Amino acid sequence: IDIANPAPPDLIGNVLEPGNKLKPELAAQGITLVRGIQPTITFEYFNMDDPVVGGYSKEKVALRRAISMAYNTDEEIRVVRQGQALPATQMIAPNLIGHDPTFDGHAKFDLPAAKALLDRFGYVDKDGDGWRDLPDGKPFTLQIASSISAFDRQLDELWKKSLTALGIRIDFVKQK
């Protein structure tokens, strides 16, 4: 028995067809594919002490919600994770005791609603440069901490795409 858990990204493209089916030439050799769910959760979080995104005022809550709504988890699963993940709807994975299949606590991807939420709370382009500004008119750049790994570079690209579509400048702070 050979196990690849988790399967390296470069292996996935070599053994699976679209739809996560084992390639026929491998099946013809007697190789089988058994899939299992790993109870692993990856999440992003906000520094609640940060003057730009932190705090509990209505506009800061709206900002964090809009950022969450602008991130396309399905695209992350399809592109970055090569179809090898499930969207997390809660902190307890589906194969663990305590998971509630009726609870869905993750923000749904909805870019138009995210933009409308930012507009409503004053995060608009006030100086005409194409980027949203803070409600007080100051420039708005979101900083995201990230590592230098190839995997994190892919996530960074998706974050950049998501926030650019939302009209928010982004600056990645690379950890060494």
Regions found by a protein language model. Name each.
Residues 1-82, 86, 91, 95-176:
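Extracytoplasmic/periplasmic ligand-capture domains
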